[in-house]
Curated annotation (Swiss-Prot):
Family assignment from sequence similarity: Belongs to the anaerobic G-3-P dehydrogenase subunit B family.
EC number(s) per entry: 1.1.5.3
InterPro entries the record matches: FAD-dep_OxRdtase_2_FAD-bd, FAD/NAD-bd_sf, G3P_DH_GlpB_su, Metab_Enz_Cyan_OpOx_G3PDH
GO cellular component: glycerol-3-phosphate dehydrogenase (FAD) complex
Designated name of the protein: Anaerobic glycerol-3-phosphate dehydrogenase subunit B
Keywords noted in UniProt: Flavoprotein, FMN, Oxidoreductase
Species, as recorded: Vibrio cholerae serotype O1 (strain M66-2)
Quaternary structure and partners: Composed of a catalytic GlpA/B dimer and of membrane bound GlpC.
NCBIfam families per UniProt: glycerol3P_GlpB, PRK05329.1-2, PRK05329.1-3
Function: Conversion of glycerol 3-phosphate to dihydroxyacetone. Uses fumarate or nitrate as electron acceptor.
Required cofactor(s): FMN
Biological processes per GO annotation: glycerol catabolic process
């Protein structure tokens, strides 16, 4: 039997956050994840809180947590609290900074808007260096939108038309520039088969790189905002964006594209690299299928690939995600947590799972369904609390990450809070801890 201090189930942003925080504190950690996480589909920014459940728009996300607690006492942020939520987000920022993916937030702690691939504006709190933090006051003279020949996962006309609907941008010129990069012939079988990964590989060639720089400098000026799809990576994306800025002297705004999202992949790669370099053990491509319980404790877990070798730990953190990641499964009449059969908060009347209108002014009820936890994020099983198991991230009940714009923030805050409680249990046996 393999034994660890902390076993983390799930390799999304919550799972990696929990595993890294425990590892930094000197614990022996194993991380078990089934495959690619939802970070491959993400914007690469961290949303803390964009809207309250009643629909009110949030400007200062941490200041709004008191109002959130009044509206939804069972919200994950309400259980974690403002202080620990802020500590968790700042810890994550420092961790990513040290992994060479610096994230920025506004000096006054407010949300900023990021321009999406659709030309809409979305509230967020932490963004990568080449995501323009729009606050409603344009400090650019024109918007230049880069369209790459043969790349179908970005629609510049849609972005331009939607962005032009903003009243404050009505008089700002918006131009689309078509860029042709030599060398695509070896990557595609038809004219519209390119993916962001293909372009990222191609731009490592000097001729392709120079062609991109030359075409941009011919049409754009330093006082423009140049919006381009995130095509720089994979593994060296920020370095290449910095190089592009230095060569062209232009100001860039990267927008995520259809999967794979290189902005999201940057974060996952940074988290993975930090975990492995820190000495963590990762079982990638494996899946926890069940566990052994004794009273109020989880004593061991079994994985699909290591059925004859159970894994035991003093503490377990579960971050298997929601429906997309199969951390929750919905049947015709019920929603279940499939790994340990944990108790799930839900409405037994399926007719009450949704509103009559798909596009509704409020969150659909099923989006708030998830694993039931106590104030310390311990789940229960058949009504009995599991004392050495913590749940975090999208599998939790009590919130709608999409409607409220808080998915990344809740994932990080709950993971950090869970591990801080684990570390508190070691307080009597003081061990060296590395703090970032």
């Amino acid at each position: 039997m393999m034994h660890y201090d902390v076993a983390v189930i799930g390799g999304g942003i919550a799972g990696y956050s929990a595993a890294l925080r425990a590892l930094q504190a000197g614990k022996k950690v194993v991380l078990i994840n089934q495959g690619q996480s939802a970070l491959h589909f993400s914007s690469g920014s961290i949303d803390v809180l964009g809207r309250l459940p009643d629909g009110s728009v949030v400007n200062q996300p941490f200041d709004a947590l008191s109002a959130l607690q009044q509206q939804v006492p069972e919200h994950p942020y309400s259980k974690v609290g403002r202080k620990n939520s802020e500590k968790g987000l700042m810890w994550f920022k420092r961790t990513l900074d040290s992994a060479h993916v610096p994230l920025h937030h506004e000096p006054d702690g407010a949300n900023h808007w990021r321009i999406t691939p659709l030309g809409t504006l979305k509230n967020t709190w932490l963004s990568q260096p080449f995501v323009y933090p729009y606050r409603g006051n344009a400090d650019f003279s024109r918007i230049m939108i880069v369209a790459i020949d043969g790349y179908r996962d970005f629609q510049p006309a849609m972005l331009r038309d939607n962005l032009a609907q903003r009243p404050e941008l009505a008089n700002t010129p918006m131009l689309t520039v078509n860029v042709s990069i030599p060398g695509f012939e070896g990557f595609r079988r038809n004219p519209n088969e390119l993916r962001s990964i293909d372009i990222a590989r191609l731009l490592r060639q000097e001729s392709a790189w120079n062609a991109l720089c030359d075409q941009l400098m011919r049409v754009a000026r330093p006082d423009d905002l140049v919006i381009m799809p995130a095509i720089m990576g994979n593994g060296d994306g920020l370095h290449l964006m910095s190089k592009l800025q230095q060569v062209t002297q232009l100001r860039f705004h990267e927008v995520p594209t259809m999967p794979p999202s290189l902005l999201g992949i940057r974060i996952e790669e940074a988290l993975h690299r930090s975990f492995i370099q820190g000495g963590g053990v990762q079982l990638k491509g494996d899946k926890v299928i069940d566990g052994d319980f004794a009273g109020s404790r989880l004593t061991a877990i079994h994985t699909q690939n290591l059925r004859d070798f159970p894994i035991s730990a003093e503490h377990y953190v579960m971050a298997t995600g929601s429906y997309f990641s199969q951390g929750l499964q919905a049947s015709q009449h019920a929603i279940q947590e499939p790994t340990f059969a944990l108790d799930v908060q839900q409405n037994p009347d399926r007719a009450q799972w949704r509103h009559a209108q798909f596009i509704a002014a409020q969150s659909h009820p099923f989006m708030t369904f998830g694993v039931t936890t106590d104030a310390n994020l311990h789940p229960s099983r058949q009504g009995k609390t599991i004392d050495n198991l913590w749940c975090c991230g999208a599998m939790l009940s009590g919130y709608d990450p999409v409607f409220e714009g808080c998915g990344g923030g809740v994932a990080i805050a709950t993971a950090y809070h869970a591990v801080e409680q684990i570390l508190a249990t070691y307080a009597q046996t003081k061990q060296p801890e590395v703090l970032l």
